Amino acid sequence: MATSSELPDHLYEQMEAGQRLRNQGYRGRFAPSPTGPLHLGNLCTALVSWLQARLANGAWLLRVDDLDQPRNRVGAVESLQQDLHWLGLDWDGPVVFQSRRRGLYNSFLSALRRQGKLYACRCSRRMLADISAPAGRHLVYPGTCRDLELFWGWHEGRLPSWRLRVSKEFSHTSGDVILRRADGFIAYHLATVVDELTLGISEVVRGEDLLVAMNAQLALINEISARPVIYRHVPLLCDDQGRKLAKREGHAGLDSLRSEGLGPSHVVGWLAASQSLVPFGAELTAGELLSELKKKEGVLKSVLKP
């Protein structure tokens, strides 16, 4: 495992600054992608994450995960901020944009590569699908490219992706994690972990669909020798066919609800009821919900899954 002292001074200082922030108290975050309007599932996660931070008298940051630029939609950043304001969910400090932190991610990538922690991988998604586990199970990368010659990709005239050699304890839960994609984009796990550590995030509250990402992120944190982040997961909202709500499926956002005449207290009440925080039919603002939960110790934590 790499030690923090092996990181370049400027990265070590960023890690130390993040740790100091964590030591000061609870710090949570909400990290949507600007790929379209937030649907009710996104907003439910935002509400629960905000409540968890405010119940702890902590900070709640808004981070925009906009690295995958071809998928970003014009106006989505402004829209998601307006939706959060409309629901009464306030954040602390300026909005953090991942697209403005590429240099930091690449510095961590270079440091890990110099330490011999990475290797080039030529596996495509199709190749991995051919060796994947049965449908519905998470694929653990089998290490196909671990022992390939380092520069195979350039010899073949194409760029590789770069994977992290995880320690034995994570080999059966995450496998070797992609940190940079073959198209040159920094991978989700690297950007997310670097942000959690350098922004001082102490606990991540996110949708249950991201539970599969936890082991990969813990494996990377382990290699950087940082104190693990606490992960909590919110049960997913599903449509009447049992499918999780998704932007690509066109599931309802706030615009359609507002057009029906529903106000913030209706939506907050419904979202809270969907997590058994209040009875269905309750109408209350985010601030009123927070006040109610302060009287009911442990109710919110009972909703969250590790």
UniProtKB/Swiss-Prot annotation:
Motif extent ('HIGH' region): 32-42
GO cellular component: cytosol
Entry-linked Pfam families: tRNA-synt_1c
Gene Ontology annotations of biological process type: glutamyl-tRNA aminoacylation; tRNA modification
GO MF annotation list: ATP binding; glutamate-tRNA ligase activity; zinc ion binding
EC number: 6.1.1.-
InterPro entries recorded: aa-tRNA-synth_I_CS, Glu-Q_tRNA(Asp)_Synthase, Glu/Gln-tRNA-synth, Glu/Gln-tRNA-synth_Ib_cat-dom, GluQ/Sye, Rossmann-like_a/b/a_fold
The protein's required cofactors: Zn(2+)
Keywords: Aminoacyl-tRNA synthetase, ATP-binding, Ligase, Metal-binding, Nucleotide-binding, Zinc
Annotated ATP binding sites: K247
Keyword Phosphoprotein: no
Binding sites annotated in the UniProt record for L-glutamate: R29, F30, A31, P32, S33, D65, Y188, R206
SS bonds (residue pairs): none
Cofactor binding: number and manner: Binds 1 zinc ion per subunit.
Keyword Ligase listed: yes
Family statement drawn from the similarity comment of this UniProt entry: Belongs to the class-I aminoacyl-tRNA synthetase family. GluQ subfamily.
PANTHER family tied to this protein: GLUTAMATE--TRNA LIGASE, GLUTAMYL-Q TRNA(ASP) SYNTHETASE
Functional note: Catalyzes the tRNA-independent activation of glutamate in presence of ATP and the subsequent transfer of glutamate onto a tRNA(Asp). Glutamate is transferred on the 2-amino-5-(4,5-dihydroxy-2-cyclopenten-1-yl) moiety of the queuosine in the wobble position of the QUC anticodon.
Protein name: Glutamyl-Q tRNA(Asp) synthetase
Organism placement in taxonomy: Bacteria, Bacillati, Cyanobacteriota, Cyanophyceae, Synechococcales
